[in-house]
Design a protein with these regions (language model features):
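Catalytic beta/alpha-barrel core
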Residues: 125-126, 192-194, 211-212, 233-234
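Non-cysteine beta-strand/loop elements that form the S-adenosyl-L-methionine
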Residues: 50, 102-111, 186-197, 255-258
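Alpha/beta catalytic cores of nucleotide-metabolism and tRNA/nucleoside-modifying enzymes
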Residues: 1-18, 22-23, 28, 132-135, ...
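Active-site beta->alpha loop and helix N-cap motifs at the rims of alpha/beta catalytic domains
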Residues: 75-146, 150-158, 162, 167-172
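Active-site-adjacent beta->alpha loops and helix N-cap segments on the catalytic face
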Residues: 58-66, 111-136, 200-220, 262-267
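Glycine-rich, positively charged N-terminal anion/phosphate-binding segment
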Residues: 5-13, 27-101
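A cross-domain feature marking catalytic cores of carbohydrate-active enzymes
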Residues: 26, 52, 80-82, 107, ...
């Protein structure tokens, strides 16, 4: 059931309670409230993020629809898109009022559509404006204000050599330092750094996640330079060992598509980071029934089953019957009148959990 998400606990108390070592990135068309509810079942601690929502949409649109979420999703952060300080501050206040534990500003999305609105990755060229936006939000809310960014931005036509995108000269690192210094001075609580450059123009968002090479060394050097500012590294992490290694030098790791396609990585990380709890990996059957019950509640409120099941295709990844599980949820969930029982039926195609 969709809710405002309010918990009755003060924003300061909530901020102190959140374990920010592992998080799941905001991903357009993916990390909606149904996806977040599903992912929450794998770990009680992982910090989840909304899809990017523009400040203008929140101020002019249906806030219940845009900002509502199930309390079980907590801890969950709201990512905003925009470049106007007063507008972002008002949207941040709306997000805090809805119960989000953090407000994040998108300064990393390289898509042409986002760039046409003069926000996303192109904002990295305007550190003074971003600092003004952060300060305005910080003055308006008590929850932490964070920024998601790249290590830099370049303009390259697709036909040109991409080799220069791999280079990172002293001038580029100086620009990165100036940007982060401006964030820190404005009161940014945490910088979330995708360890790639953003190529503006000529590359699609998908290509921007693959063609610019990963430069964890740049993020590591940034952490050495800004030792007092929490820095989370994002980009390209594929398994638990890589994440745990990165936690040795960073303040957190943000996972993206790996968590979506192989959500059990979240359970593996939870167990690795909390060995004192001696909790076994959550059973797939338990997760399946949790989602079936959720679907029953949501369908009663008018939600289509397919809107929920589309996020569940990785539940039985690597297990016997996984292909049949995915096929049933991918197709039958779209049938008129499809109900939550379909989730249970799909689970029966797989090995006992």
């Amino acid at each position: 059931m969709q809710s405002t998400g309010k918990t009755g606990i003060s924003s300061d108390q909530e901020a102190e309670k959140v374990d920010r070592r592992i998080s799941v990135a905001p991903m357009m068309d993916w990390t909606d409230r149904h996806c977040r509810y599903f992912l929450r079942g794998f770990s009680p601690d992982v910090l989840l993020y909304t899809e990017m929502i523009t400040a203008a949409a929140i101020l002019r649109g249906d806030r219940v629809k845009l900002l509502g979420f199930d309390p079980e999703e907590q801890p969950v952060a709201l990512q905003l898109g925009g470049n106007e300080p007063a507008q972002l501050a008002a949207a941040a206040a709306a997000g805090e009022g809805a119960g989000y534990c953090e407000i994040n500003l998108n300064c990393g999305c390289p898509s042409d559509r986002v760039a046409s609105g003069a926000f996303g990755a192109c904002l990295m060229r305007e550190p003074a404006l971003v600092a003004e936006c952060v300060a305005a939000m910080r003055a308006r809310v008590r929850v932490p204000i964070t920024v998601k960014m790249r290590i830099g931005v370049v303009e390259r036509a697709k036909r040109e050599s991409i080799a220069s995108v791999a280079d990172f000269n002293d001038g580029e690192f100086d620009a990165l330092q100036r940007f982060v210094a401006a964030l820190e001075a404005a009161g940014c609580a945490r910088a979330i750094v995708h360890a790639r450059k953003a190529v503006l123009g000529g590359l699609s968002p998908k290509e921007n996640r693959a063609i610019p090479p990963l430069r964890y060394d740049i993020v590591r050097e940034l952490k050495r330079t800004f030792s007092q500012l929490p820095i989370v590294v994002n980009g390209g992490f594929r398994d638990t060992r890589e994440v745990l290694d990165a936690l040795g030098w960073s303040d957190g790791v943000m996972l993206g598509r790996e968590a979506y396609h192989r959500p059990f990585v979240l359970a593996e990380l939870h167990c690795a980071l909390h060995p004192e709890r001696t909790r076994p990996l959550v059973a797939r059957g338990t997760l399946l029934e949790r989602m079936a019950s959720y679907a029953e509640r949501e369908i009663a409120q008018g939600t289509r089953l397919a809107a929920i099941t589309r996020h569940m295709l990785g539940l039985y990844g690597g297990e016997p019957g996984a292909r049949e599980f995915r096929r049933l949820l991918s197709h039958a969930a779209h049938a008129p009148g499809a109900g939550a029982q379909l989730i249970r039926d799909a689970g029966r195609l797989c090995a006992p959990a």
